[in-house]
């Protein structure tokens, strides 16, 4: 006798919406599917709803729903069935609204999004709204002043037309730099509201006890940081940490890319033993350590502090790794129980 199959818990969902050619599809393809930014120039418009599963690590798994740019509300066909938009908004965790910053005037791109915001909030008041002011990479955005002007324009327009009860955050993004990864990092963090405060407290304690300057918990595959300490995130520091991950993986591919049988492996060269220490010419040390399945702790500190506290750092990082498993332990225990229940029903 075989037990009925266990239904998997629905994954949290991130919904992308915005006008045609605003860059919705380019964003998630660059961040989560490793597409080169230049390749996105050849992407066509999204004719139908696209659903992608992101499951790079064992702790944070979610779906991306990419809506066609000409969607103007009402019903939508999903896998051959007509579904009302209220059901869609009710099941979402985050709604990402993408605005083309190169649209002139930018208010024209915002007009169609207001109804979406109001309709979604009416159905799901707990929904998080994230506005990506995208494509800030044109000739008119070579300095910070026009970027800030565009941000101010969007914020003012939204504030005048929607309720103050609606939670809206704004991000200036481009697929040609790390700003899009920083923006998506803050979106992904909304999917773990129960665990995020604990992770941030752990990272705060780590940098305080080890005299570090900054720390990130990275999803290695996407370069999205799942958590960071409460010190401000400087883009140069974030880019440096991302570059370190790239170099560490590239070196692992060259010198450690074989499996147990001695054959070349096509999997990402990153495992439970992965660790790297980079010493920069300016006296800074970058420290990378694997702490979970495709999860890496990356820290930045002064070389003098690292030399004095290397043993303490190793000990505290090991404690962090063990505690990380405990933070997500209820989730892992439930999944293990489901697997045991399924196997116990077989005879």
Which ranges hold each PLM region?
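Short, flexible boundary segments at extreme N-termini or domain junctions of P-loop NTPases and their
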Residues: 1-19, 46, 50-53, 156-159, ...
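Glycine-rich phosphate-binding P-loop
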Residues: 12-35
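Switch I (effector-binding) loop of TRAFAC-class P-loop GTPase G-domains
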Residues: 32-61
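Switch II of P-loop NTPase G domains
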Residues: 48-50, 59-119
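Canonical P-loop GTPase G-domain recognition
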Residues: 126-129, 138-214, 233-237, 243, ...
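A charged amphipathic helix-loop-strand protein-protein interaction module that recurs
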Residues: 199, 232-286
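Short hydrophobic alpha-helical segments used for membrane anchoring or interfacial signaling
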Residues: 215-221
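Short hydrophobic/glycine-rich mini-motifs in sensory/regulatory modules
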Residues: 290-298
């Amino acid at each position: 006798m075989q037990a009925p199959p266990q239904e998997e818990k629905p994954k949290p969902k991130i919904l992308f919406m915005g006008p045609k050619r605003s860059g919705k599809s380019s964003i998630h393809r660059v961040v989560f599917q490793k597409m080169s930014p230049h390749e996105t120039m050849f992407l066509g418009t999204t004719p139908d709803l696209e659903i992608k599963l992101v499951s790079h690590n064992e702790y944070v798994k979610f779906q991306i729903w990419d809506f066609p740019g000409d969607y103007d509300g009402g019903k939508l066909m999903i896998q051959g069935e007509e579904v009302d938009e209220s059901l869609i908004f009710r099941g979402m965790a985050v709604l990402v609204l993408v605005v083309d910053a190169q649209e002139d005037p930018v208010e024209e791109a915002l007009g169609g999004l207001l109804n979406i915001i109001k309709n979604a909030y009416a159905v799901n008041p707990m929904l998080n709204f994230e506005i990506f002011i995208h494509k800030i990479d044109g000739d008119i955005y070579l300095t910070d002043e026009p970027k800030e002007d565009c941000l101010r324009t969007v914020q003012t327009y939204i504030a005048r037309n929607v309720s103050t009860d609606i939670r809206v955050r704004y991000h200036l993004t481009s697929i040609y730099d790390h700003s899009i990864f920083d923006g998506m990092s803050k979106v992904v963090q909304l999917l773990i509201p129960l665990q995020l405060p604990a992770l941030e407290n752990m990272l705060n304690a780590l940098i305080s006890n080890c005299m570090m300057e900054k720390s990130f918990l990275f999803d290695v595959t996407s370069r999205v940081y799942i958590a960071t300490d409460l010190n401000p995130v400087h883009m140069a520091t974030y880019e440096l940490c991302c570059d370190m991950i790239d170099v560490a993986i590239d070196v692992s591919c060259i010198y450690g890319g074989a499996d147990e049988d001695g054959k070349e492996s096509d999997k990402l060269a990153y495992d439970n033993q992965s660790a790297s220490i980079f010493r920069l010419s300016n006296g800074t040390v970058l420290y990378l350590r694997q702490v979970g399945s495709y999860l890496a702790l990356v820290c930045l500190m002064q070389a003098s502090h690292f030399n004095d506290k290397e043993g303490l750092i190793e000990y505290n990082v090991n404690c962090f790794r063990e505690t990380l498993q405990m933070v997500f332990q209820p989730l892992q225990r439930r999944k293990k129980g489901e697997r045991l229940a399924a196997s116990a029903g077989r005879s």
